[in-house]
């Protein structure tokens, strides 16, 4: 990953790098890999995340249809 530093503005370059890393999911992956996760725990976590995503999508869909 590469970020260009313009006009010696390191703070802006760091913000851009952090945003790119966040978008790529690097921080989330690092947090998950700090400790070993048993395969059964991983499946349970992924299933819970999928359920959460589905609920959020359904809620958004209902809200959109309710607005019409």
UniProtKB/Swiss-Prot annotation:
Pfam families in the record: Ribosomal_S21 (PF01165)
Molecular-function annotations in GO: structural constituent of ribosome
GO terms under cellular component: ribonucleoprotein complex; ribosome
One example of a Gene Ontology biological process annotation: translation
Signal peptide: none
Listed InterPro entries: Ribosomal_bS21, Ribosomal_bS21_CS, Ribosomal_bS21_sf
Keyword tags: Ribonucleoprotein, Ribosomal protein
Chain ranges passing through the membrane: none
Listed PANTHER family: MITOCHONDRIAL 28S RIBOSOMAL PROTEIN S21 (PTHR21109), SMALL RIBOSOMAL SUBUNIT PROTEIN BS21M (PTHR21109:SF0)
Family from the record: Belongs to the bacterial ribosomal protein bS21 family.
This protein's name: Small ribosomal subunit protein bS21
């Amino acid at each position: 990953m590469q970020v260009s530093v313009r006009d010696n503005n390191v703070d802006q370059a760091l913000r851009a790098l952090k945003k790119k890393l966040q978008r790529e999911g690097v921080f989330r992956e690092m947090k998950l890999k700090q400790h070993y996760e048993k395969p059964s725990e991983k499946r349970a976590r992924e299933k819970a995340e999928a359920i959460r995503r589905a609920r959020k999508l359904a809620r958004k869909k209902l809200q959109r249809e309710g607005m019409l």
